[in-house]
UniProtKB/Swiss-Prot annotation:
It catalyses: 2 D-alanine + ATP = D-alanyl-D-alanine + ADP + phosphate + H(+). It comes from the Bacteria. The lineage of its organism: Bacteria, Pseudomonadati, Thermodesulfobacteriota, Desulfuromonadia, Geobacterales. ATP binds at residues 135-188. Its cofactor is Mg(2+); Mn(2+). Pathway: Cell wall biogenesis; peptidoglycan biosynthesis. Binds 2 magnesium or manganese ions per subunit. NCBIfam families: D_ala_D_alaTIGR, PRK01372.1, PRK01966.1-4. It holds the Pfam family Dala_Dala_lig_N. This is D-alanine--D-alanine ligase. HAMAP family: Dala_Dala_lig (MF_00047). Mg(2+) 2 binds at residues 269, 271. One of its GO terms (biological process) is cell wall organization. It comes from Geotalea uraniireducens (strain Rf4). Belongs to the D-alanine--D-alanine ligase family.
Length: 310
């Protein structure tokens, strides 16, 4: 849709929601809402709850800007509802969202696309999980299959830490991913209109890029562009676009990598609804490409559509 067309529509900014990332989503949504108002759009902020279908009807929402993170927002659930209601929305469709949110299925898609992933093993609730079952050695990373923002993630360096890490991860999911720890630089690629904008390097103050480092000022250094040799920089941009396509993503995303000294690019995940807060990385990458926050929001909105063919 064109800007002129969109300015005749009622834009619902979907935010908050029911996931462990609710507070982050409220910040993303507030920033997006303010940007749309500043550009003259008829926009309403909607804190998503289980009555969201009735709210969308009551508010006469024509187009949805999804600023949700985590379950029910980033996993295909809200996308499916919007498809049924015939409300065009921003970001990826049902299948791509569900695949990206499930780290296990996403890894399988990445492997099929010949992208590099860390060795891993899946455990389900009720399994007798033991380090002896792994085909790789400590340290390892333990994470829930379907949470974002590093919720429930632990680095295990000693065998005595494994049980507690698994217990913590199982608080959030029935399936747990145990990955080989890869030593490398945290590099994240911003995708807009299905093309790589650039890559940013993250240097956390803590041992790894955890929830606090992502959302607390001063807890991580952001280096843009990432400090990589030119050919390796181009390689990680291509890998970001390949990962975005491998899951069938639409419009925009953020693709997270670990890049080793040897030049290997290990993909961690694709975020189909990346953060839009003051500390968020996609807006920072966009600024580095000359795209201000309001412009970024407007370009994301312009790509809003229904993804399931009629």
């Amino acid at each position: 849709m064109t800007v002129d067309e969109l300015k005749t529509k009622k834009i619902g900014v979907l935010m908050g929601g029911l996931s462990a990332e609710r507070e982050v989503s409220l910040k993303s949504g507030a920033a997006v809402h303010q940007a749309l108002l500043a550009r003259g759009y008829d926009a309403v902020a909607i804190d998503v709850d289980r009555d969201i279908a009735q709210v969308l009807v009551r508010e006469w929402v024509d187009v949805a800007f999804i600023a949700l993170h985590g379950r029910y927002g980033e996993d295909g659930a809200i996308q499916g509802l919007l498809e049924i209601m015939g409300i065009p929305y921003t970001g990826s469709g049902v299948l791509a969202s569900a695949l990206a949110m499930n780290k296990i299925f996403a890894k399988q898609a990445f492997q099929a696309a010949r992208l590099t992933v860390a060795p891993y093993k899946v455990f389900c609730r009720g399994d007798k999980a033991a380090l002896a079952e792994l085909e790789f050695s400590l340290p390892v990373v333990v994470k829930p299959s379907q949470e974002g923002s590093s919720v429930g993630v632990s680095i295990v360096k000693k065998e005595s830490e494994f049980a507690a890490a698994m217990k913590e991860a199982f608080r959030y999911d029935r399936e747990i991913l145990v990955e080989q720890f890869i030593k490398g630089s945290e590099v994240q690629v911003g995708i807009l209109e299905d093309k790589a904008l650039g890559a940013i390097e993250i240097v956390p103050k803590n041992e790894f890029y955890d929830f606090d480092a992502k959302y607390s000022p001063g807890m991580a250094e952001h280096i843009l562009p990432a400090r990589l040799p030119a050919e390796l920089y181009r390689k990680v941009l291509r890998a970001g676009e390949d990962a975005h396509r491998a899951l069938g993503c639409s419009g925009y995303s953020r693709v997270d990598f670990l890049v080793t000294e040897e030049g290997a690019c290990y993909i961690l995940e694709v975020n189909t609804l990346p953060g839009m807060t003051d500390l968020s990385l996609l807006p920072e990458i966009a600024r580095g490409s000359g795209i201000g926050f309001e412009d970024l929001v407007e370009r994301i909105l312009a790509a809003a559509a229904l993804k399931i063919s009629q």
